[in-house]
């Protein structure tokens, strides 16, 4: 029986309230899946506002080309999320997504053979499943990536750490800036047991995570919820990674 967690994550929606400087009193109101991307709204927004649209801003921050659920974890906005759209640098979101999938495949296996030997049709279907928010179709293809013939070597993991002042980021997360920690993280410990999240955090960020058991100075959030330190990394990857294959954790300083 499949786990209910992936389906719940694919079903989650983020409500949006989007305005354009030329039409500040006429918002575009919608909701999109947590695993979707703001850039996928651009054709509808350009038509609605009758203006070129390509860049998204929250307060004074131009948002990066990340899954909308990760952006919400980073900036912790009130919902519906009030954004401004304007003309700016365009995003080639499909290529960016597939490059991340290839990178995650390489991290997991030490090579990118699983994704590289896939047909063009399957890689296109993988991206189309994200566009359509079609979890069953996505899972049929992604299961081949996650179940390589060789043992899992590393877990693709990115940890987003606030770099602005602790008082500023705690009180106004929308003003925070972040650095991304990306380190090769083995799926098992030296004793061959599954590596736990707390162990990984202590290895990579010992100053913030002096204990591998409890969140003393900081915690991590994923998909809007705190993550237990005793969760095995491989289980988290299989259950809660973003569609591009990456496990994305946001550090919240306590």
From Swiss-Prot:
Gene Ontology cellular component list: Atg12-Atg5-Atg16 complex; autophagosome; mitochondria-associated endoplasmic reticulum membrane contact site; phagophore; phagophore assembly site membrane
Subcellular locations according to the entry: Preautophagosomal structure membrane
One Pfam family here: ATG5_UblB
PTM summary: Conjugated to ATG12; which is essential for autophagy. Conjugation with ATG12 involves ATG7 as an E1-like activating enzyme and ATG10 as an E2-like conjugating enzyme.
Disruption phenotype: Blocks autophagy. Significantly decreases the radial growth of colonies under nutrient-rich conditions. Strongly reduces conidiation and completely fails to form any perithecia.
Family annotation (InterPro entries): Atg5, ATG5_HBR, Atg5_HR, ATG5_UblA, Atg5_UblA_dom_sf, ATG5_UblB
Quaternary structure, from the entry: Conjugated with ATG12. The ATG5-ATG12 conjugate forms a complex with several units of ATG16. The ATG12-ATG5 conjugate also associates with ATG3.
The protein's name: Autophagy-related protein 5
Organism name: Gibberella zeae (strain ATCC MYA-4620 / CBS 123657 / FGSC 9075 / NRRL 31084 / PH-1) (Wheat head blight fungus)
